[in-house]
């Protein structure tokens, strides 16, 4: 009986979570991801999510410059036919499964950078600053302007955090780590 109840509660939880995700997309494309948690492949406008194995644990430096970027502007000006940056998603998924941080960093990419960076060069400056301070990879998140850098050790990440704060390239700077918790 207890097992049946537990299974029943688990089914209710999964159904409620799915409903929350469906409703959440009406608020914003990122909401379903926040509800789902963990590593996922996002498709469409970010609302179609497929769970992936957990990302390798690593320090992450996040930097947001003192600018705002219109997501609408970025998508209106995105010309996929003219874009040479096309991340190999299948290879990146294999890198995530293999938990190879350096390969993940080498194969990650964001086509939206082709629109955002020419209009807001500080984003590229932040990426270069992270890389020159030890990040194994740095990329703009979504349509921007926030940039994240992946590090393979805590000490390097802490030094990069201090360097980013003193550079004044970003108004908000955070040092965190990959969080893998999916229930």
What are these regions (language model features)?
Residues 2-13:
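Single conserved hydrophobic/aromatic residue that forms the stacking wall/gate
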Residues 14-137, 150-183:
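ATP-dependent small-molecule kinase catalytic core of the GHMP/sugar-kinase superfamily
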Residues 147:
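Catalytic nucleophile-His microenvironment captured as a short glycine-rich beta-strand/loop
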